[in-house]
Amino acid sequence: PPDTMQGLVLMANGIGVGFSGNTIYPSEPFALYAYPLKYQISTEYPVVGLGAFGQSVFVGTTGNPYVIQGSDPGSLTMTKLPQKQACVSKRSIVEMNGGVVYASPDGLMQVTESNGLSSLTAGLINRDDWQSFNPSSFSSFELDSRYYAFYDNGTTQGCLVFDFGAKPNFHKLDIYATAGYNERRKDALFLAIG
């Protein structure tokens, strides 16, 4: 792979996908050492981060988001979604509920294969309040279909917990984690606090 490649994610079909600048690098299936130049895909805007879900990869950029789909690296297709909802934090990208959730300037967005891009926080929090949490600082995790966003707005650190169940809501916690790991086998979220 190129020396500058970062953000490696793995699709369900064994294709590794990384990026550098505005170039996407797919690998040969199950060969994460082989990234032929002929598979490269370019985006209009610089890539912020990636998120894999099913046979798809979410591409968060500084402009429009994209979705890459396909079963073979030679026939991957990339779709530019029409909404200008930039990804403001690569650490906000979380796979959950059959898609990818990420922080945009306007709120949390979800990308799924069936519904495309939709806002999860419209009606829950207005843009000014959202911006007061500095979404570009988010370090986020999922547990039991809840989205945990640890934030630092320069004066306050904390955690926003979004529950997108039957009655969507969110609340704040007075804890701040610098890192975390979702241990699926134990159904637990381990956090580095302090």
Describe each PLM feature range:
Residues L10, V17, I41-T43:
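A structural/positional concept
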Residues P1-P2, A31-S42:
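A short helix->beta-strand "capping" segment at the edge of beta-propeller domains
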Residues G14-Y33, Q69-G70:
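Blade/loop signatures of beta-propeller domains
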Residues G14, T43-G194:
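Beta-sheet-dominated scaffold domains
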Residues P1-N13:
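Disordered, low-complexity "stalk" and linker segments at domain junctions of extracellular
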